[in-house]
């Protein structure tokens, strides 16, 4: 298999080209070599062969969960809470789980009508919501694409801008993690690339952009990999992808001063590092959807590092999982009690949410 590589560096600088875990089977040894087209000889030049194998996967984190009883929820929606310790730290978290064939999974985007709203306001305004969590990371706009009722709701903002993200003041073409459901309630998880407005390509592996390393051309039907067919009815993109096909996609290994698995070029301090409040969205082996939040930055709960969040989601049975906006944006609303996680001041208004609704 020949994979098209990154742009050739303009200087003699050595760059790393990475192979994501999503493309590797941990039980298989692979033989790889780099290649480049040589114009003078009219043929490919190949490097020596290297042998690689996916490193052993981190163990899932299993916590003690208690089912919460809320009379206004249907039996198809379950909510669980843990008040425990993780890696020696206090840890409080909640997750809701449901089959999207029994209840609706939807994405709400109030910015489409020109406003930001709290999670609770979005849930209440919907009228038929059971559980709702905050959605995509945002600055002046949501980062990524949002699909509602089969159409792109917001303008695509996939660029990584040096003035906003820590990307050495260069533009990196990327793909974004996305999770959603089709019109029949079948969940899917992919990376989405959008070369231009209203042109979507979905992939089962990410473009492996790494700040200061490989830079890639814009996506196409065949680049960085052949795209896959997917027709989401409701979907939200954020990231990074935490778990894909059962494999944990994130760690804290570095290339220079940047994280090697930060393929989507997220801000390292604000997203990739630290242990703040976290929000995540997952899909289990049997097609259920998991909505997760944890408290952070308080004595009662010290939050989760990104690799820990991936291990937690895998421990909940997620075959696929994606990080959502965290920190002050983290919030879970449940019909009956309202907001269930901790907040020491007013709830932040957010630009998108996702959750479970009546069919």
Residue ranges and their predicted role:
Residues 1-57:
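Short, surface-exposed linear motifs at loops/turns and structural transition points
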Residues 11-13, 46, 90, 173, ...:
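Residues that act as N-cap/strand-start positions at coil-to-secondary-structure junctions
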Residues 57-197:
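Zymogen propeptides
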Residues 90-95, 176, 237-239, 275-280, ...:
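Short glycine-rich loop/turn motifs
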Residues 96, 130-134, 178-180, 188-190, ...:
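Structural recognition of the beta-strand scaffold that forms the well-ordered cores
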Residues 99-102, 140, 180-188, 243-246, ...:
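Short acidic-glycine loop/turn motifs at beta-strand connectors
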Residues 141-268:
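Active-site-adjacent helix-turn-beta-strand microarchitecture at beta-sheet edges
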Residues 141-170, 257-320, 329-359:
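Conserved, well-ordered active-site substructure
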């Amino acid at each position: 298999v020949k994979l098209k590589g990154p742009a050739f560096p303009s200087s003699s600088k050595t760059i790393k080209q990475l192979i994501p875990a999503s493309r590797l089977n941990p039980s298989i040894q692979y033989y790889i070599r780099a290649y480049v087209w040589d114009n003078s000889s009219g043929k490919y030049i190949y490097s020596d062969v290297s042998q690689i194998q996916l490193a052993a996967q981190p163990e899932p984190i299993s916590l003690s969960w208690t089912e919460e009883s809320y009379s206004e929820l249907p039996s198809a929606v379950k909510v669980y809470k843990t008040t425990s310790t993780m890696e020696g730290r206090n840890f409080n978290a909640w997750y809701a789980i449901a089959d999207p064939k029994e209840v609706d999974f939807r994405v709400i985007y109030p910015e489409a009508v020109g406003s930001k709203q709290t999670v609770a306001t979005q849930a209440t305004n919907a009228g038929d919501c059971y559980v709702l969590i905050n959605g995509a990371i945002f600055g002046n706009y949501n980062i990524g694409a949002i699909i509602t009722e089969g159409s792109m709701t917001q303008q695509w903002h996939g660029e990584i801008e040096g003035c906003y993200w820590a990307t050495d003041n260069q533009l990196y073409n990327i793909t974004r993690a996305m999770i959603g459901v089709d019109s029949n309630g079948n969940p899917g998880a992919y990376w989405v690339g959008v070369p231009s407005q209203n042109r979507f390509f979905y992939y089962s592996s990410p473009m492996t952009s790494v700040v200061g390393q490989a830079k890639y051309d814009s996506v196409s039907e065949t680049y960085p990999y052949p795209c896959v067919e997917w027709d989401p009815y409701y979907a939200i993109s954020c990231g990074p992808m935490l778990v894909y096909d059962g494999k944990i996609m994130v760690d804290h290994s570095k290339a220079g001063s940047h994280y090697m698995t930060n393929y989507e070029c997220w801000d390292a301090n604000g997203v990739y590092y630290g242990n703040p409040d976290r929000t995540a969205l997952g899909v289990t082996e049997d097609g259920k959807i998991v909505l997760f939040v944890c408290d952070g930055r308080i004595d009662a709960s010290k939050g989760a590092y990104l690799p820990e969040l991936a291990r937690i989601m895998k421990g909940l049975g997620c075959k696929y999982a994606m990080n959502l906006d965290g920190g002050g944006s983290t919030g879970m609303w449940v019909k009956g009690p309202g907001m269930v996680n901790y907040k020491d001041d007013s709830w932040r208004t957010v630009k998108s949410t996702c959750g479970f609704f009546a069919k």
